[in-house]
From Swiss-Prot:
PANTHER family assigned to the protein according to its UniProt record, in alphabetical order: ILEAL SODIUM_BILE ACID COTRANSPORTER, SODIUM-BILE ACID COTRANSPORTER
Tissue expression pattern: Expressed in ileum.
Residues carrying covalently attached carbohydrate according to the record: 3, 10
The protein's assembly and partners: Monomer and homodimer.
UniProt topological domain (Cytoplasmic) ranges: 50-87, 148-157, 217-224, 306-348
Organism: Mus musculus (Mouse)
Annotated protein name in UniProt: Ileal sodium/bile acid cotransporter
Length: 348
């Protein structure tokens, strides 16, 4: 009998009508390629973020760390706790809760630095908070995950991939450190790298969505609970960050800065950690959450920007600045012409 007429060309064992066809490894290859590309692009984004850090100003905030300390409490206190409360209250699956917590433990994103400039925030504080949260995430993310996932780990329903998370965070810190060095030695080149990195960050999000849509097609059947968490989480971060900063006696412009740094997470990092840490079966359940958070953190950031612009127009620029001077800290507020120039237009 001619087996070639009934067996596929790639069959390995044929006997009559019975054939053994090897499983397609296309998804496995694509998954490996995606993980590698995401890691490289994320390293480029974080390298560019480091190029936005001026070492002497960063050290200045370290010497007067009250603003950074408030930001630290927001970043690694409020956000993980909020993620835990939302996860327990909504009753989502343990693996989904872990991803929500990873998002809550992620450091601030570079987008907050741009928005801080647009809302007349403290640019030096914004960049310093982003840098500090990125460096501290190396220890704080595993610690927060250990504390908040204990109820699921002890019950045996989930295993936290600390090794993958640790490798991702180490790979994150090294490019930031190199970027800081480049900005210290070659500030003009660092400014160009920063702009390239901003574009790379957008490409990274699009790439995650497109390739992820191919690999994890069932992930796009999104539970309403994840939509609800993805909506509430960023607005809770913005609001709680603002009120905690105000409660700590920070001036209005720093309150706006802390609010943005708290609510705007590094979603590219979260997506990369999730991609590297979970099995394809788990990714089908959780892959879309970082994208949901990305959408709503940008939506609410745009709302905040719109409210602030309206406020400035209603009060007038001079009146608005006068109101902020009542904080008695305007004399110490850095001038935008003298602060971080990464987001300034090139001089002609």
């Amino acid at each position: 009998m001619d087996n070639s007429s009934v067996c596929p060309p790639n069959a390995t064992v044929c006997e009559g009508d019975s054939c053994v066809v090897p499983e397609s490894n296309f998804n496995a290859i694509l998954n490996t390629v995606m993980s590698t590309v995401l890691t490289i692009l994320l390293a480029m984004v974080m390298f560019s973020m480091g190029c936005n850090v001026e070492v002497h100003k960063f050290l200045g905030h370290i010497k007067r760390p009250w603003g950074i300390f408030v930001g630290f409490l927001c970043q690694f206190g409020i956000m993980p706790l909020t993620g835990f409360i939302l996860s327990v209250a909504s009753g989502i699956l343990p693996v989904q809760a872990v991803v929500v917590l990873i998002m809550g433990c992620c450091p601030g994103g570079t987008g907050s630095n741009i928005l801080a400039y647009w809302i007349d925030g403290d640019m030096d504080l914004s960049v310093s908070m982003t840098t500090c949260s990125t460096l501290l995430a190396l220890g704080m993310m595993p610690l927060c995950l250990f504390v908040y996932t204990k109820m699921w780990v002890d019950s045996g329903t989930i295993v936290i991939p600390y090794d993958s998370i640790g490798i991702s965070l180490v790979a994150l810190v090294i490019p930031v450190s190199f970027g800081m060095f480049v900005n210290h030695k070659w500030p003009q080149k660092a400014k160009i790298i920063l702009k390239i990195g901003s574009i790379t960050g957008v490409i990274l999000i699009v790439l995650i969505a497109v390739i992820g849509g191919i690999l994890y097609q069932s992930a796009w059947i999104i539970e309403p609970k994840l939509w609800i968490i993805g909506t509430i989480f960023p607005i809770a971060g913005y609001s709680l960050g603002f009120f905690l900063a105000r409660l700590a006696g920070q001036p209005w412009y720093r309150c706006r800065t802390v609010a943005l740094e708290t609510g705007m997470q590094n979603t590219q990092l979260c997506s990369t950690i999730v991609q590297l840490s979970f099995s394809p079966e788990d990714l089908n359940l959780v892959f879309t959450f970082p994208l949901i958070y990305t959408v709503f953190q940008l939506v609410f950031a745009a709302v905040i920007l719109g409210i602030y612009v309206t406020y400035r127009k209603c009060y007038g620029k001079n009146d608005a600045e006068f109101l902020e001077k009542t904080d008695n800290e305007m004399d110490s507020r850095p001038s935008f012409d003298e602060t971080n120039k990464g987001f300034q237009p090139d001089e002609k």
